[in-house]
Amino acid sequence: MTIRSLPALSPLALSVRVLLMAGSLALGNVATAASTPAAPAGKNVTWEDIANDHLTTQDVLQYGMGTNAQRWSPLAQVNDKNVFKLTPAWSYSFGDEKQRGQESQAIVSDGVVYVTGSYSRVFALDAKTGKRLWTYNHRLPDNIRPCCDVVNRGAAIYGDKIYFGTLDARVIALDKRTGKVVWNKKFGDHSAGYTMTGAPVLIKDKTSGKVLLIHGSSGDEFGVVGQLFARDPDTGEEVWMRPFVEGHMGRLNGKDSTPTGDVKAPSWPDDPTTETGKVEAWSHGGGAPWQSASFDPETNTIIVGAGNPGPWNTWARTSKDGNPHDFDSLYTSGQVGVDPSTGEVKWFYQHTPNDAWDFSGNNELVLFDYKDKNGNVVKATAHADRNGFFYVVDRNNGKLQNAFPFVDNITWASHIDLKTGRPVENPGQRPAKPLPGETKGKPVEVSPPFLGGKNWNPMAYSQDTGLFYIPGNQWKEEYWTEEVNYKKGSAYLGMGFRIKRMYDDHVGTLRAMDPTTGKLVWEHKEHLPLWAGVLATKGNLVFTGTGDGFFKAFDAKTGKELWKFQTGSGIVSPPITWEQDGEQYIGVTVGYGGAVPLWGGDMAELTKPVAQGGSFWVFKIPSWDNKTAQR
């Protein structure tokens, strides 16, 4: 293995250079199908299969392990009594030199594991043996602009096709048996910063009865306007597109439909000197829905996070001599309920109005039944935001039900006002403009930093304990303003930063929290940042991975560490579990990378010793152990 040797990064400049290098390294990729035998034909995946993904155990068909994104499994063959006997069943190496940034959640169907790799690759593996069935290597151009490493977070499956996105702004359908391309659709200009890193998902529109493929764009840090797409999964043709910057025009059936919100976009300042009549930032305003959407079939609503506004600099999105609190930069840094029939916005709740800190609202939206302090049940979303607060929102209308901190020492706001739904900001936490003649403003110490109290790595919800298991980080940053102007293909931030430790003995924390009271039930600390997702099971277990390569299991009620295994590289992906031939399997993608080593300042230095890698590991109780492997 190669030991990571990225240097500590000065704010912005070196990060961008490393990202551009990532694009050039990918040039040698060639689109291929494996010469090994095709995957078993199996049955086509139906919408009913996907709709029941959270209930069934033999497959994992959707990102989040169900349309509700709870990452909860009813499997209990592996449990708190026998997890110490968990051993590797097999592992598969992704091979070649692309050993970094493996953030993929695998899916499983009919005895085949489909897992994506960094640099826009897909692998089909026999779920019992790890035998490679086929590989797809997407050929990438040398001018891709991924902000946060060359990652891919997963694929989707429906019918006889596998779907995934690429770093050159494409969504592709592959034949699930052979890996051959069925269709390939370009949705944005990759040289301007459009990419796709999140896993697409399938939903079924109750109104039309049609199954749709839903995916978003990435690229906020390069000044793109974020877009959510619905496609025909058979042909790849666009059904609708919804932009997440107020006043930008949507599309329906290939024609302009309606603007998002008010066509005059009052939440963005006017500027009569420009072609649009709005400030420059409005044309490059971000809001990209780069994480996977959840779907509520009861209300027929797609629910997805909207990314940070562009640029990060709050003053570029505020009128001259104006107050940032008068310009919310809609529809960024929040959660959006979208009508699957038309792509219209049904409701919007903003976590961070006029976000000055890159607190992108993209973290997963978990659908669950929330019981308030009076015992009333609300169909809700749960969201642990990068800004450090945990939100419970009514998924019927987007109204806030509860909010509380899930990390320590939040500086930018004192609390979330439950009546207004808005944060109560602390004075002095929006960095001031540079003084005349200066190139940067006075630094401010902010917590959480822009990488968040929790980033994209998804939490899990246990239907047994009623707790959320949140992989967070306790850290802070020095943060200052810089001059900013849009240039195609260049980072569009207007801010400088350096992330620092908050505590000497740990950065990462896995916390079990009660969504009604906000109470911390238990906590596990890690020396390195936590960037892996979480899995909860009926076996009273919680699984996650660590930056130094351990895959770990905890008692879901007490937080006691029950088992761990060294995989050889840092884990920055969500684990899954499934049942096959009467045995429970647990799988996780392994290979360090992602945003921390690229953007993390002191944290990049901390993670230097972590080995790079690229593999998929599968564990189970040994078949010969019939005494404790309860079936």
Swiss-Prot record:
This is Quinoprotein alcohol dehydrogenase PedE. The lineage of its organism: Bacteria, Pseudomonadati, Pseudomonadota, Gammaproteobacteria, Pseudomonadales. It is found in: Periplasm. Ca(2+) 1 binds at residues 53, 56, 59. Its cofactor is pyrroloquinoline quinone; Ca(2+). Induction: Repressed in the presence of lanthanides. Disruption phenotype: Cells lacking this gene are unable to grow with ethanol, 1-butanol, and 2-phenylethanol in the absence of La(3+), but the addition of 20 uM La(3+) to the agar medium restores the growth of the mutant strain. Cells lacking both pedE and pedH show no growth under both conditions. It comes from the Bacteria. Belongs to the bacterial PQQ dehydrogenase family. Homodimer. Interacts with cytochrome c550. One of its GO terms (molecular function) is alcohol dehydrogenase (cytochrome c) activity. NCBIfam families: PQQ_enz_alc_DH. Ca(2+) 2 binds at residues 221, 308, 358. The soil-dwelling organism P.putida KT2440 produces 2 PQQ-ADHs, namely, PedE, which is Ca(2+)-dependent, and PedH, which is lanthanide-dependent. These enzymes are crucial for efficient bacterial growth with a variety of volatile alcohols. The functional redundancy of the PQQ-ADHs and inverse transcriptional regulation of PedE and PedH represent an adaptive strategy of P.putida KT2440 to optimize growth with volatile alcohols and aldehyde substrates in response to the availability of different lanthanides in the natural environment of the bacterium. Binds 1 PQQ group non-covalently per subunit. Keywords: Calcium, Disulfide bond, Metal-binding, Oxidoreductase, Periplasm, PQQ, Signal. Pyrroloquinoline quinone binds at residues 103, 153, 197, 215-217, 386, 531, 595. The active site is at 358 (proton acceptor). Disulfide bonds join 147-148. Its EC number is 1.1.2.8. Residues 250-286, 421-443 are annotated as: Disordered. Residues 1-33 form the signal peptide. Pfam families: PQQ. Alcohol dehydrogenase that catalyzes the oxidation of a range of substrates, including linear and aromatic primary and secondary alcohols, as well as aldehydes, allowing bacterial growth with a variety of volatile organic compounds (VOCs) as carbon and energy sources. Uses a specific inducible cytochrome c550, encoded by the adjacent gene in the locus, as electron acceptor. The keyword Hydrolase does not apply. GO terms for cellular component: membrane; outer membrane-bounded periplasmic space.
